[in-house]
Amino acid sequence: LEWTQAILEAAEAKKAPVLIQTSMGAAKYMGGYKVAKDMITNLVDSMNITVPVAIHLDHGDYEAALECIEVGYTSIMFDGSHLPFEENLKLAKDVVEKAHAKGISVECEVGSIGGEEDGIIGTGELADIEECKQMVATGIDYLACGIGNIHGQYPENWKGLAFDHLQAIAEAVGSDVPLVLHGGSGIPQEQIEKAISMGISKVNVNTEFQLSFAKATREYIEAGKDLEGKGFDPRKLLAPGK
């Protein structure tokens, strides 16, 4: 709730369209995809948000993708990157067909993203160029591709984004296909800006929010604010993180 409010407030203040995404784990924690979707749409209404707001499923399996299509998400990521490529391709085609029938956009991934996301650990790899071309041919609306990026915090010995590989992917799939950069937290700003100039159109950020939220909440408690008056009220306890 607090994150959604903060994101919507920031988007409205900047007059910038925003995409709010839920992972499978986050949606389960919140009570399901319909609960998450309804909360966002109701907040958009009650907060008088005027900028476009997309509701996106992040790293969803086949079943999650179909459920989000049914409950009204406006954008779906089907992630079959852990499956044999032919199976990934087959399921992606089916998700695209079902989603496009309802005007919903689809993101798919080639080359697993490194790090951990909701308990799922990706080894991290550079996306295969030919597989990227085949995935785009399914009719997906945007493509997530491994270019050295990872989920979570980046290690000190991280070598940076593989820009040569990003350029090769962009040239292979064409300029009409937006590319997606997962693991945006921790990537230096200049690398993000360079990636955008080379075809990246969607940058996912999560860990950065989690760390900021945790830091502000911890400082509130360590300062003893939760012991002052009704400072223990979750609305006050979580406000600094928001």
Predicted ranges, named:
Residues P188-K242:
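C-terminal alpha-helical cap/extension of soluble enzyme domains
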Residues L1-A26, Y33-T50, H59-D176, Q189-I200, ...:
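Alpha/beta enzyme core
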Residues L181-S185:
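Glycine-rich beta-strand-to-loop/alpha-helix junction loops that act as flexible
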